[in-house]
Amino acid sequence: MRTWKNVFAVAVVGVLTAGQAKAQRTLEGMQLLTVNENVTTVITASEPVRFVDISTAKVVGDQPINNTIRLKPKEGVDVNRDGDILAVVTIVTERYRTQYGLIYTSRQGEAVTDKTIETDERTAYNNPAVSMSTEDMARYARQIWTSPARYRNVATNRHRMTMRLNNIYSVGEYFFLDFSIDNRTNIRFDIDQLKVKLNDKKTSKSTTVQTVELTPEFTLDSSESFHFGYRNVIVVKKMTFPNDKILTIELSEKQLSGRTISLDIEYADVISADSFNKVLLYEH
């Protein structure tokens, strides 16, 4: 959870994307949200929030999940009066910016509790920290998920299950790893964790294997269980690694004595990843 407090920087994020005319926004033209010290105001964006600025220390906030922020005044009627402008909050996501003026009210029933950022409240913004938006990752992943398998010889058999690599695609700074599992038992697989690791190749039983766990940038399917079939696409940052290491996708079960199945991918398969045609994003 990220928390902001005592952010005194003036919230002037007036840089528009290339080709747009310069523009200014004043508080009079800004949407206002009424806030109260006993009410949490929750603002939800349509995509991950990358930056938040609260222009004064009169309001505090935090970010419990990646697309949601919470705001609340620090003081009540002893300090604030109805109609006081407490702060301006600036919210920057992957592709747009939004600003709200926060107005104090002493009446809890007037305070905004839940606010969704509407389309007409967004100003397009080319965030330099984001090379690919989550929405675009999802579009690529869905297209890859529906595409035929190009790999036939990378698979693992364990616990009467087969885990196989279907595709590896390279898009910008990311690898898209498409894999599936066939469950030939009658026992449902309740997913505990899906992990991506960089492991040393095992050379002997006495060799100590070093493992580096990688955090996926995006996972297409968040299902918690499957019965006979499972397919998913995960996105990881592009990387290079020596031939004595392998990339491993591991799926484990929730039960204490649960099943675990993993798939090892050689470096040669990773570096031969096909480039995914962006035109496919917009095909229907």
Predicted regions and their residues:
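Bacterial Sec-dependent N-terminal signal peptides
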Residues: M1-L27
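A general "mature secreted/periplasmic domain" signal
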Residues: K22-H284
